[in-house]
Amino acid sequence: MAEIPDGLLYSEEHEWVRGDVSPGATVTVGITEYAAEALGDVVYVEPPSVGDEVRAGDVCGELESTKAVSELYSPVTGTVTEVNGQLENAPDMVNSDAYGDGWIFKVELSEGNEDLLDADAYGEKTE
Amino acid sequence: MSTAETPALRSPLHEEHVSLGATMTEFAGWDMPLRYSGDVAEHTAVRTAAGLYDLSHMGELMVTGPDAAAALDYALVGHMSRMRLWAAKYTMMCDANGGIVDDLVVYRRDWDHFMVVANASNRIEVARELAARFDAGGFDAAVSDETAALALIAVQGPAAAAIVGSLCAAGEAEPAGLKYYSAANLLLEGGHHAFVARTGYTGEDGFELFVGADVAADVWRSALAAGASHGLIPCGLASRDSLRLEAGMPLYGHELSADTTPFDAGLGRVVAFEGPAVVLSSSQPGAAAPGAGLSDQVDPRAVSVERGAFVGREALARVADQAPGKVLVGLVGDGRRSPRAGYAVTDEDGRQVGIVTSGIPSPTLGQPIAMAYVPPTLAEVGTEVGIDVRGRREPMRVVALPFYKRQA
């Protein structure tokens, strides 16, 4: 079973969010272990660029495995402040450490997001 | 995400996959392993050591009867009656328009007994077509779908011969002595009988073991145990697809379809228009049939006749000497974003001129690779084309197939 840690928030599109989701705060975003397992070995991550304005629910990048390609959705609205450059050479960290070193980008929120799920609610979605 | 009303078919090895923790997927109506550990690890194991596959979804159609060889000569585009005993042959069934109904591997198990291995997605249609064509041609031959009674277990990779050898009972012929695309009945440790063929779909050396469904789990576990010290791991259909694509092998529904002739796919060599056929004379039944073994002698009851009519012959003869309207090519890109099946091949002005049939980031090459149909003017090796990869044009160039060839 894929791990779904408490203390993170989750989107319907299988992204996780770490941090306070109120305007002005900066959060870290990645994809869940469930999504990583479904995708298979990730061989390429195309994150958004630093400075991009992203909107909750919109496509902002893509992830590619040998088997499939998946769009990356932003779970929050704001400005991208940082992307995980380690994924350039080690995209498989998305599989091996989805909630840690496999983080994808950080966003400074311009608005809050009330629609994200807690671990229990997200867990129900993946059953 | 199956919405089909009929439940997915299960391999005799289903419980083995569940206990190994496989990620399962619905494939052509079957619930089959997609992966166990990881796609790239499984792909690499087959290239460098060995992988174990459950291919029990493939269709096994037994064709028997005095006219079996002549019946297949008529029903398929290849010249089955010329096959030696225990040989395997890659061939196709085409429709009257020359369109491909399925690509097949046919094994000659006896002079009057062939096993036709069909893709899971086409099994029922191929069985029905074979029976209809035998009937239409007035042949004394029968088709029996044995898929449910058999399991197909493949051991693929450079260590395959050693592993399959260790599965065989003491004193049995060494599988390593089998030629590529030939087969034998072998007795395995534990007393299980297996029809073992040196065939595969990965671009590596390998064997396919057809065994009874009732002993499949035993053979599977033996192979896992015997292969462990050789680096063998269980592998799923995801790695089978990436391996076959690197090896430039076509997949029905992607490179091959009813809208495609063997000539379009660059496989015109499978169509035999001419040549003497050696068929059993049905007027002399009952001669002693050769027993199991690696024999390739000609049956004493055989008579020689010229290659005659076969379904699709006229249509295929018309296109055989024409310049094809489309050509199947290999493409390699230097970027990282990979084309996928269905993406448009574009010219310099961004107009669609072709279509990608399969595409992946190649685990062995570390670059995106694809097969695509393009106009003959863009088919020369070295030609630069563009692929519309999810809204952005990615440059790729035509290369000779296969992308990967094992060292001899």
Q: Which sequence ranges carry the predicted segments?
A:
Chain A
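A short beta-strand motif that forms part of the nucleic acid-binding face
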Residues: 33, 67, 76
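Short, charged/polar surface micro-motifs in flexible loops or helix N-caps
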Residues: 37, 77-80, 86-87
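Acidic, low-complexity mobile loops and tails
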Residues: 1-59, 92, 96-127
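Residue-level recognition of beta-strand microenvironments
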Residues: 17-20, 66, 83-86
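Charged, alpha-helix-enriched surfaces in structured cytosolic catalytic cores
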Residues: 75, 89, 117
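Short, charged beta-turn/beta-strand-edge "cap" motif at the junction between a beta-strand
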Residues: 60-61, 66-67, 86-87, 111
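Conserved hydrophobic positions within beta-strands
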Residues: 14-17, 63, 72, 77-80
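Short, Lys/Arg- and Gly-enriched loop/turn segments at beta-strand edges
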Residues: 64-73, 90-93
